[in-house]
Amino acid sequence: WKWGLYATAIYESDNERFTASLGLRADANNYSSKMKNMLDQLSPRLSLSYRIAGDIYLNANAGRYYELPPYTVMGFKDNDGNYVNKGNALQYIRSDQAGLGLEYRPSSFLKFTAEGFYKHYNRYPMSVIDSIPLASKGTDYGVMGNEAVTSTATGRAYGM
């Protein structure tokens, strides 16, 4: 089983020039004791938008996100039928993210956006066999994650 809660609050200025959204999400499941407590997977999020001029907006966002490891990782068993990674203290993958960008809204149904982003990953599944994070392995049209892992890899991603 898995469960989660989400709440959000939105503020919009009277002149519709500024909008802020604050959210909080919590997730959990019964896979292991490391994943059962929703407080261990609290994900705060903040999004801001400010109309600079006319149809041009400056947008910014930041947040923490938790994601379940791949089901192939969670379901990997040894020859005796034991869930290997349950015993390896497998955890949710954590990602801290931030973004900043410009948006042009020429009409109510069309918008153009350019945004830069940065993501920092923590607790990513790392292969016990070869010490390579699963994100760096690729799939080559095969199955990824059918092996013993620990939640110890870190990483980052950034771009436009």
Regions found by a protein language model. Name each.
Residues 5-11, 46-50, 100-104, 160:
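Residues on the lipid-exposed face of transmembrane beta-strands in outer-membrane beta-barrel proteins
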Residues 65-121, 131-132, 137-160:
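Outer-membrane beta-barrel signature, preferentially recognizing the C-terminal barrel domain
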Residues 1-33, 41-45:
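Surface-exposed extracellular loop regions of Gram-negative outer-membrane beta-barrel proteins
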Residues 16-20, 55-58, 108-112:
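Repeated loop/turn-to-beta-strand initiation elements of outer-membrane beta-barrel proteins
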Residues 33-34, 71:
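Short, solvent-exposed loop/turn and secondary-structure capping segments
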Residues 1, 38-40, 54, 94, ...:
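Residue-level preference for beta-strand/loop junctions
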Residues 22-28, 60-64, 114-118:
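Transmembrane beta-barrel strands of outer-membrane/channel proteins
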